[in-house]
């Protein structure tokens, strides 16, 4: 996969939207665990008050954002881990967060990894999908995506009927302009989108 070109050379918001419908999975020991990306968020670097790199912040914890596009950036909050990918050229610390997937591969293993939680609770949030894949640490932080057991299949894209742009989730401490910036993308009507109300679920999960 040509991740370097995919994650550079165009606005991060465009990259983020283009991830919707792509297969994303973790492959280890011959088993494939994952599904289609249904929700993602863009973070635009040093000027984005919601970004970990806002104001030029750089540390061991967020170094992944500063690396070349296509580098994995995994960060932790309490006992949870979250999966991001650096965008743009090295030194321009922008990135995308994979927020949710519709599970397709390795469902039995996902169910075990999530302690029996099933249905939409399996992967309808960024920490949940990492748990479902069995990822509990930052071991793959800073690794090039191409050299890791994670795969985003750029040769396939499940078409969505509608991709919605909305404010990012949980951004309350930032400047209102950034808190309300429409930098979250999701498949309209897909039940695996975090916070999607049951009344808004589509029978076809929002796919064409």
UniProtKB/Swiss-Prot annotation:
Q: Does the keyword Oxidoreductase apply?
A: no
Q: Quick one: signal sequence residues? A: none
Family the entry assigns: Belongs to the DNA glycosylase MPG family.
Which Pfam families does this entry report, sorted A to Z? Pur_DNA_glyco (PF02245)
Name the Enzyme Commission number(s) assigned to this protein: 3.2.2.-
This chain belongs to which protein, by name? Putative 3-methyladenine DNA glycosylase
In terms of domain of life, where is this protein from? Bacteria
One of its GO biological process terms is: base-excision repair
Give the UniProt keywords, A-Z.
Answer: DNA damage, DNA repair, Hydrolase
UniProt entry tagged with the keyword Repeat: no
List the InterPro entries. Answer: Formyl_transferase-like_C_sf, MPG, MPG_sf
Q: What general EC class does the enzyme of this chain belong to?
A: hydrolase
* Molecular function in Gene Ontology: alkylbase DNA N-glycosylase activity; DNA binding
